[in-house]
Amino acid sequence: MAPMGIRLSPLGVAVFFLLGLGVLYHLYSGFLAGRFSLFGLGGEPAGGAAEVAVDGGTVDLREMLAVAVLAAERGGDEVRRVRESNVLHEKSKGKTREGAEDKMTSGDVLSNRKMFYLLKTAFPNVQINTEEHVDASDKEVIVWNRKIPEDILKEIAAPKEVPAESVTVWIDPLDATQEYTEDLRKYVTTMVCVAVNGKPVLGVIHKPFSEYTAWAMVDSGSNVKARSSYNEKTPKIIVSRSHAGMVKQVALQTFGNQTLIIPAGGAGYKVLALLDVPDMTQEKADLYIHVTYIKKWDICAGNAILKALGGHMTTLSGEEISYTGSDGIEGGLLASIRMNHQALVRKLPDLEKSGH
């Protein structure tokens, strides 16, 4: 007697084979959809941070610098256009820790959109952190033409590849929003910074209303330089307009009555004050001090530029700032160039306590 079992005709075998192929196809297409979503083709996550692709290969920092300059300038165009229209659509995002209004305008939003999507389209596999919310429903594809400007090629002759997963981009689409609403245009900047493994390696600070752009890459090149001299004994100290009096009291005790305090808006503007900037609207200072909480997108670009030029930006206790993790720092800020930075840190032991 023949063993019991199921016999399939050739047609049945073919049907089972096709069903198997169908199952495999759906499994594989689902896998691909997941991969594509990681590469930014399936929409942006909520908030100001973009997802990072898994195993994203490498990116060229020289190309990133070229796109960062373009992004800062494109964002600056939006900032200038909105300000000159005199229709800012100003609103408050809430209060800062010091109790001031945290303002936002159409200039912030439109600049953020241009800057974020230009960088995201060019480098879909890197983490991008930005001050303003990224609206996934308002997605825009802005294509970079892959041309590196001659001034960058002149300073940085060769590509510099790094793993995409090691990169974090910090965008400030409009620094000094308070001053922007007051029409104090000289303080306003747009900024882009690239950090690798938390260390700032390239920065761009663009002034939309004078159309000046400073950029630098650590261990590579820059289009800006330090000034020829600085006054370390009785320095001019640039500080935020909101707490100039607080810093002045301690600075006079530390450096003497000849010390000059320069109140100013915008972290980008304050860093440029330490450098040799060919802009008649730019004030000059020897030190930049900040004594309260500050966000990393405000300072990363300036930190990278100072570092590339041999300068320093640390907390008030002298600690290096890591551009990973949280989006702010608690320990205040001290920035200098061509000075004994650690000696300055030791001179200012009480400033951080004064800021809280």
From Swiss-Prot:
Sites where a glycan is attached: 257
GO cellular component, as recorded: endomembrane system; trans-Golgi network membrane
Residues with the N-acetylmethionine modification: 1
Residues engaged in binding Mg(2+) 2: 172, 175, 298
Pfam families: Inositol_P (PF00459)
Residues holding AMP: 240, 243, 266, 270
Keywords: Acetylation, Glycoprotein, Golgi apparatus, Hydrolase, Magnesium, Membrane, Metal-binding, Signal-anchor, Transmembrane, Transmembrane helix
Function comment: Exhibits 3'-nucleotidase activity toward adenosine 3',5'-bisphosphate (PAP), namely hydrolyzes adenosine 3',5'-bisphosphate into adenosine 5'-monophosphate (AMP) and a phosphate. May play a role in the formation of skeletal elements derived through endochondral ossification, possibly by clearing adenosine 3',5'-bisphosphate produced by Golgi sulfotransferases during glycosaminoglycan sulfation. Has no activity toward 3'-phosphoadenosine 5'-phosphosulfate (PAPS) or inositol phosphate (IP) substrates including I(1)P, I(1,4)P2, I(1,3,4)P3, I(1,4,5)P3 and I(1,3,4,5)P4.
Family: Belongs to the inositol monophosphatase superfamily.
Protein name: Golgi-resident adenosine 3',5'-bisphosphate 3'-phosphatase
Species in which this protein is naturally found: Rattus norvegicus (Rat)
Encoding gene, per UniProt annotation: Bpnt2
